[in-house]
Amino acid sequence: MRIVLLTGFEPFDQDPVNPSWEAVRQLEGVQLADDVQIIARRLPCAFATAGARLAQLIDELHPEMVIATGLGPGRSDISIERVAINVNDARIPDNLGEQPIDTAVAPDGPAAYFTTLPIKAMVRAVRGAGIAASVSQTAGTFVCNQVFYLLQHALAATAVRSGFIHVPYLPEQVTGSQRPSMALETMVAGLHAAVLAAWQTPVDAKEAGGQVS
């Protein structure tokens, strides 16, 4: 069986749940084709251990595609990331109490890595399912960006395609506030559409997905 590895994060910043994992775990075992299956795994939300855990999973599972996901506070849609940057600049401590500021993700690495996923086709597929989606130009500077960067760094010399998706809060996480959210079933459907499009699309669509600022 060929494997697509899909990851989400454990809860952080005193939240009891992380929607990325709650959504990803629903896709465990889903088949994208007769011989292609999603394997879902959870990553720690910690600079010291997240990348190592992801590397371990890649070594164990030998996936043909890897898509990491995480919570994007303030996001209102399925946000498919374009680029990871070589900087850690944590606004809050991670789950091990570490808060790196202006440090390199990989001192020997380039300034940035682009995703190798067909992000325009993925956005089109999610929107085609009636779910809000967009290409995102920044994955932040917390553990999500670090994992995204380390993922691309690890697979840069391989044929394994990889990238990162941010998801919104769940409605129950933002009760009484004006912050955007997305129902879990909608999130799951959006991720499924995105992952399926990523698997089925060898060459990305040529259409606008940028931002003015």
Swiss-Prot record:
Highest taxon in the source lineage: Bacteria
EC number of the protein: 3.4.19.3
Keyword Cytoplasm in record: yes
Signal peptide as annotated in the record: none
GO biological process: proteolysis
Residues annotated as catalytic: 81, 144, 166
Pfam families tied to this protein: Peptidase_C15 (PF01470)
Localization annotation: Cytoplasm
GO MF entries: pyroglutamyl-peptidase activity
GO cellular component terms, A-Z: cytosol
Sorted UniProt keywords: Cytoplasm, Hydrolase, Protease, Thiol protease
Chief subcellular location: cytoplasm
Catalytic reactions of this protein: Release of an N-terminal pyroglutamyl group from a polypeptide, the second amino acid generally not being Pro
Subunit relationships: Homotetramer.
Family statement: Belongs to the peptidase C15 family.
Function: Removes 5-oxoproline from various penultimate amino acid residues except L-proline.
HAMAP family (UniProt xref): Pyrrolid_peptidase
NCBIfam families per the UniProt record, alphabetical: PRK13197.1 (NF009676), pyro_pdase (TIGR00504)
Name used for this protein in its record: Pyrrolidone-carboxylate peptidase
Protein's organism: Pseudomonas fluorescens (strain SBW25)
Record lineage: Bacteria, Pseudomonadati, Pseudomonadota, Gammaproteobacteria, Pseudomonadales
